[in-house]
Amino acid sequence: MAFANLRKVLISDSLDPCCRKILQDGGLQVVEKQNLSKEELIAELQDCEGLIVRSATKVTADVINAAEKLQVVGRAGTGVDNVDLEAATRKGILVMNTPNGNSLSAAELTCGMIMCLARQIPQATASMKDGKWERKKFMGTELNGKTLGILGLGRIGREVATRMQSFGMKTIGYDPIISPEVSASFGVQQLPLEEIWPLCDFITVHTPLLPSTTGLLNDNTFAQCKKGVRVVNCARGGIVDEGALLRALQSGQCAGAALDVFTEEPPRDRALVDHENVISCPHLGASTKEAQSRCGEEIAVQFVDMVKGKSLTGVVNAQALTSAFSPHTKPWIGLAEALGTLMRAWAGSPKGTIQVITQGTSLKNAGNCLSPAVIVGLLKEASKQADVNLVNAKLLVKEAGLNVTTSHSPAAPGEQGFGECLLAVALAGAPYQAVGLVQGTTPVLQGLNGAVFRPEVPLRRDLPLLLFRTQTSDPAMPPTMMGLLAEAGVRLLSYQTSLVSDGETWHVMGIPSLLPSLEAWKQHVTEAFQFHF
């Protein structure tokens, strides 16, 4: 699934020259313009399908909605706070980041902050520059034997843990996603948050800024902490409540804080920055030559690999699209879209609940990536959106009055005469169920409402299909249908029938293009519909 029409990319922030070179070597046109106003950014994007930014460019809803050609936004770094994800997703624009690019640099800065807090190195340096010699004022504390609480145990959190363990620190932590067994493998004991607060001598945060993490350290949690706790935030401004932190510093509950990020950057309120026990930097977490080179290289490689259909990594807002690049999953994504398109043509404008059912071991976890593809098939002809795709499908489906559920059946190979893996799409409470599978790399239709096709019907993007159901006992039906095709001037490209089910047979005809009307057909058959996905 290559983004074949992605041809031109705007780089709107300063990036390593390797980024431009990799993009150009991959066949993409590149424009580099920095310090653009919103209006200038919108103007530049009118001719670009791709945009690569760092943190300076703000990709707002206004920018996204005005950029008619934009398909992909790449963030050369981890956080995507400067990209309106909801607006991008709604418009079907893919958002990517480079989650590994600045991890080491951010981890090293965090470790440096911890050491500076322990020994007050920046304050002592400032004192020396003032011509003073204040040995007693800057009494520090050893890290050996102290407890470090790490909130967020992803790439950066675990790098911090392994480094600070070398200083003899005990590392405990919390992460709602990483299992205790995994964190134990890199030396971090996971505990509930309420047990972490009173144990820590130092606390460092490494979570994204979410509603659940905003103000994670606040007046209440500071009150539960050990008196004299030291806090580090090199993640995102807002995770630590800045007002609560200032109050904790003023009361002595917090002995020191090291901040690389702020709720507002640069901060207009200088109370924290100016506090004598606060060490601060102007958001330098990724500001190393190595990180900048790595992030620029990684985002460029991700763009080129995506365009060439090789792989898709670093996706922030479309798990299904990532799966669509897997050699195993790609044909199943195509099958899911085909069955969704079939279901819409068959059931009209379905309302209620669409059931997406997978069967077979290799599809055990595929429902969440196949259901968006089913939605694309259901909505692409009916949505008022210019483009329904795997990025925005789940966001748009509820607006269409549909609920989509997924379920899985671990059926044994050969059960019911089917292959090991199947995908079924059904309309709950209505007589509409289509079943398909993948043969080699070809999606095929296996059955409709229990009527099985032998052999299965290939589902190809270049072959419109006409489907109709008839009474099996009518010998005049085939010549009648051929006559209707002849009257319409349409050639028959393929023809298959199902096994008899409840005295009726399904017929599938491959035709060069969809017929203008099926009224003449419906006079001779039980039901008829056509589709092309």
UniProtKB/Swiss-Prot annotation:
Mark the transmembrane ranges: none
* Modified residue annotations for Phosphoserine: 14
- The chain residues annotated with the modification Phosphothreonine are 78
Q: GO BP, one example?
A: L-serine biosynthetic process
Task: Give the Enzyme Commission number.
Answer: 1.1.1.95, 1.1.1.399, 1.1.1.37
UniProt keyword list? Acetylation, Amino-acid biosynthesis, Isopeptide bond, NAD, Oxidoreductase, Phosphoprotein, Serine biosynthesis, Ubl conjugation
Residues where NAD(+) binds = 78, 155-156, 175, 207, 234-236, 260, 283-286
Q: Where is this cross-link: Glycyl lysine isopeptide (Lys-Gly) (interchain with G-Cter in SUMO2)?
A: 21
Task: Show the catalytic activity.
Answer: (2R)-3-phosphoglycerate + NAD(+) = 3-phosphooxypyruvate + NADH + H(+); (R)-2-hydroxyglutarate + NAD(+) = 2-oxoglutarate + NADH + H(+); (S)-malate + NAD(+) = oxaloacetate + NADH + H(+)
Question: Which pathway features in its UniProt record?
Answer: Amino-acid biosynthesis; L-serine biosynthesis; L-serine from 3-phospho-D-glycerate: step 1/3
The active site lies at 236, 265, 283 (proton donor)
InterPro entries from the entry?
ASB_dom_sf (IPR029009), D-isomer_2_OHA_DH_cat_dom (IPR006139), D-isomer_DH_CS (IPR029753), D-isomer_DH_CS1 (IPR029752), D-isomer_DH_NAD-bd (IPR006140), NAD(P)-bd_dom_sf (IPR036291), PGDH (IPR006236), PGDH_ASB_dom (IPR045626)
Q: Where is this cross-link: Glycyl lysine isopeptide (Lys-Gly) (interchain with G-Cter in SUMO1)?
A: 21
Is Signal a UniProt keyword of this protein?
A: no
Q: How does it assemble?
A: Homotetramer.
Biological function: Catalyzes the reversible oxidation of 3-phospho-D-glycerate to 3-phosphonooxypyruvate, the first step of the phosphorylated L-serine biosynthesis pathway. Also catalyzes the reversible oxidation of 2-hydroxyglutarate to 2-oxoglutarate and the reversible oxidation of (S)-malate to oxaloacetate.
The identity of this protein, by name, is D-3-phosphoglycerate dehydrogenase
Query: Which gene is transcribed and translated to give this protein?
Result: PHGDH
